[in-house]
Swiss-Prot record:
Ranges of biased composition (kind: Polar residues): 1-13
Name of the protein described by the UniProt record: Histone-lysine N-methyltransferase mes-2
Spans annotated as Interaction with mes-6: 1-194
Enzyme Commission identifier(s): 2.1.1.356
Lineage, opening ranks: Eukaryota, Metazoa, Ecdysozoa, Nematoda, Chromadorea
GO BP: any one term: negative regulation of gene expression
Organism listed in the record: Caenorhabditis elegans
């Protein structure tokens, strides 16, 4: 076992411009000798960046410590493995004292040593006559195992064969997985392998281009110091962390420097708790050796109130990405209300359910905790209130689940409720009898005022007309405020450069006539996220997630009559396909939570339904993939489509802007990209997973459809719409908005009849219909 470590080196050059071809040479792929083998240390647990001199000194000290522990652990591992191997393969070793290929030995005996063995031999194969489409008979002879298991000699087999026409060969395509809806994908900070770009490509040159884009490094460009597996890593971390007093980032980074092909620094930082689950003894707490990890998984789970998706209401949704948010305010107020029966009720006379029945509680005990009025005493039941936040923080063994269930089951007699939902044999629970459950309800009851009860309660919903007017006034006031800031900036610029300020302001107003009109213009500049804050929503609310967009959605927890909330439309059924519909004009699909008249929630196929609801319902035109006259494969219609009618959605992996840059750097070298950028941030990549829309080709002169970004259930999705009336079997094309460089690359692909399309420019953004206007 060697104690040497791969030599380190710093990057020899900066990242080159994307899209430029790397230098090539004849022969196999080669690696550069002077490579930046390791990425820089990342401040994961440290608040400040560690100085380079201090970091290198700490790394060297940590290396010596880890290597000292490693030698003893590796020796112990070798002894354990040797004993297991001797036990497990002892019988096999007896029967396999020498390695013999019986099949090869018999062939050598029959054919002679050193003779070439022909796998196939063709006989009686006549030439194929192109004018005569009859195919002559042929036979194929091949060698099978020449002896049976019993040792009997087998005969050679001859099988008849014939030649057939190959026919048209479809263009090849990259393997992909079909999906119906885009899936949120986390960033890949570590490149798992270096892609193959062809023979003669210098991997070292490509490495220099990509290393700065992957903060966790590229696997395979540095050698491990020695062999390591999960068991050895667990033993090593447990031994080293006991006495380690340095920076945790230096510790995990040193592990990465010693074993760069095992994991990255970020992966090492979260590996120890997982290793403890597999190898540690029962009851061992990993946080005792990693005190810098303050947030525990269990504590996070206790604070999680609602793990449902904010968009589709699915439990821990994988499509939109699970985002656990803790709202400041509870919907429908901060309190639950329930009716609790009072003792000495004539209707409850009779036998008690047990010796610990709630009926044994006296009215004096109740009066010390609750304050029922005279009417409640006559009715023999009192109205109590439970604070939602208190129940959310309450452990289950203290009765949190019982209180939650009782709120929705007050119609059941209390004794029957306890018999149904309280486990008397549960030793861990503190609530094990009817009397315990009654005392629990009394102890959880809150004495609140009428004013406090109204806090958080939803207001009565205004009419659609009032909500539209409020929203309109709010948007116009925001537009005026933005216009004033813009004009003030132009005046400062004119004063600095000696220009005419009024002229600059007039030119600015003329560039967009909508700024001077009374029409509301909605533009989303960030992804739509439901706001969770106290107080009204406006441009000055710092904690409002809707502040930059200036629009709240139906998912927000603000008041239902919030002037910033998008009110939806009031169109008749089937009319939401023109700019007269404010949902269609704002690039929002209709939603049953806001639109009441357009029948977007209808499920009956016999009635007229909303026409601005295609992506939500996933109602798409039937399409198929086939050879295209433009380039490779293309997308074709199986049914006609009217002008501006929704055809299909562009689905794939929903990735961030940084991840799109990383993938784009690799795709550009293939001259093939399926990344579709969204103006509000992120992109859709259908390279590996997607739908048939990935085959839509580029046509800048006569496109048959256009792409449009729509807000659907709070997220931006890309749809293709017909630019004119389209017939069956017409190819679906749209303008990729190529730059001059990409136009040249596209013409080269057309000449070579490539099966895949060249990369779309990274600068392409979609926010509105891409029309010729």
């Amino acid at each position: 076992m060697s104690n040497s470590e791969p030599s380190t080196s710093t990057p020899s050059g900066k990242t080159k411009k994307r899209g430029k071809k790397c230098e090539t040479s004849m022969g196999k792929s080669k690696k550069s000798k002077n490579l930046p083998r390791f990425v820089k240390i990342q401040p994961i647990f440290s608040s400040e960046k560690i100085k380079e001199t201090v970091c290198e000194q700490g790394i060297e000290e940590c290396k010596r410590m880890l290597k000292g522990h490693f030698n003893a652990i590796k020796d112990d591992y070798d002894i354990r493995v040797k004993d297991e191997l001797d036990t497990d393969i002892k019988d096999w070793l007896k029967d396999a004292s020498s390695s013999v290929n019986e099949y090869r030995r018999r062939l050598q005996e029959n054919l002679g040593e050193g003779r070439t063995i022909a796998k196939f031999s063709f006989k009686n194969c006549e030439k194929y006559e192109e004018n005569d489409y009859k195919v002559s008979d042929s036979t194929v002879t091949w060698i099978k195992p020449d002896r049976t298991e019993e040792g009997d000699l087998m005969k050679k087999f001859r099988a008849p064969c014939s030649r057939i026409e190959v026919g048209d060969i479809s263009p090849p395509m990259i393997y992909w997985v079909p999906i119906e809806q885009s899936v949120a994908t986390p960033d890949q900070l570590r490149l798992t392998h270096m892609p193959y770009f062809g023979d003669g490509i210098d991997d070292g040159n490509i490495y220099e281009h990509l290393i700065d884009m992957f903060p966790d490094g590229i696997h395979g460009f540095s050698d491990n110091w020695s062999y390591v597996n999960d068991w050895i890593l667990y033993k090593l971390c447990r031994a080293a962390l006991k006495d380690y007093q340095g920076s945790p980032d230096v510790f995990y980074y040193t592990l990465y420097r010693l074993w760069p092909n095992k994991s990255s620094q970020r992966e090492f930082s979260s590996a120890f708790p997982v290793l403890c689950e597999n190898f540690a003894e029962k009851g061992f707490d990993p946080s005792s050796l990693e005190p810098w990890k303050k947030t525990k998984i269990a504590e996070g789970a206790q604070n999680l109130r609602n793990p449902t998706c904010y968009a589709c209401l699915a439990y821990t949704c994988a499509i939109h990405g699970f985002k656990a948010e803790i709202p400041i305010e509870f919907p429908n107020g901060e309190f639950y209300n329930a009716m609790l029966p009072l003792p000495n009720n004539p209707e409850n006379d009779g036998k008690m359910c047990s010796g610990n029945c709630w009926k044994s509680v006296t009215m004096k005990e109740v009066s010390e905790v609750l304050v029922p009025d005279s009417e409640e005493i006559l009715q023999k039941e009192v109205k109590i209130y439970f604070m939602k936040s208190r129940i959310a923080k309450m452990p289950i063994e203290d009765g949190a689940l019982i209180v939650n269930i009782y709120v929705f089951n007050t119609y059941i007699p209390f004794c029957e409720f306890v018999k149904k939902y309280v486990d008397e044999d549960d030793e861990e629970s503190k609530i094990r009898s009817c009397r315990d459950a009654y005392h629990l309800m009394m102890s959880m009851a809150e004495n609140v005022s009428a004013r406090r009860l109204k806090m958080g309660q939803p207001s009565n919903r205004l009419s659609i007309k009032d909500r539209v007017n409020n929203f309109r006034r709010n948007q116009l006031s925001q537009e005026k405020a933005k216009r004033k800031l813009r004009h003030d900036s132009l005046r400062i610029q004119a004063l600095r450069d000696g220009l005419d300020a009024e002229k600059l302001i007039r030119e600015d107003d003329m560039r967009d006539s909508q700024r001077n009109s009374e029409k509301v213009r909605m533009t989303a500049v960030t992804p739509i996220t439901a706001c969770r804050h106290a107080g009204p929503c406006n441009a000055t609310a710092e904690n409002c997630a809707c502040r930059e967009n200036g629009v709240c959605s139906y998912m927000c927890k603000c008041d239902i009559n919030c002037s910033q909330r998008f009110p939806g439309c009031n169109c008749a059924a089937g009319q939401c396909y023109t700019k007269a519909c404010q949902c269609y004009r704002a690039n929002w699909e209709c939603n049953p939570m806001t639109c009441n008249m357009c029948k977007c929630d209808a499920i009956d196929s016999n009635i007229i339904k909303c026409r601005n609801f295609g992506m939500t319902r996933m109602i798409q035109k039937r399409t198929y993939c086939g050879p295209s006259k433009i380039a490779g494969n293309g997308l074709f219609l199986l049914e006609p489509a009217e002008k501006d009618e929704f055809i299909t959605e562009y689905t794939g992996e929903r990735i961030s802007d940084d991840e799109a840059e990383r993938r784009g750097a690799i795709y550009d070298r293939y001259q093939c990209s399926y990344i579709f950028n969204i103006e509000t941030g992120g992109a859709i990549d259908s390279y590996k997973i997607g739908n048939l829309a990935r085959f839509a080709n580029h046509d800048s002169k006569n496109p048959t459809c256009y792409a449009r970004t729509m807000v659907v259930a709070g997220e931006h999705r890309i749809g293709f719409y017909a630019k004119r009336r389209l017939e069956i079997s017409e190819e679906l094309t749209f303008d990729y908005s190529y730059s001059g460089e990409h136009q040249i690359a596209f013409r080269m692909v057309q000449t070579k009849e490539r099966s895949e399309k060249p990369s779309r420019p990274k600068s392409q953004k979609l926010s509105k219909p891409m029309t010729s206007e």
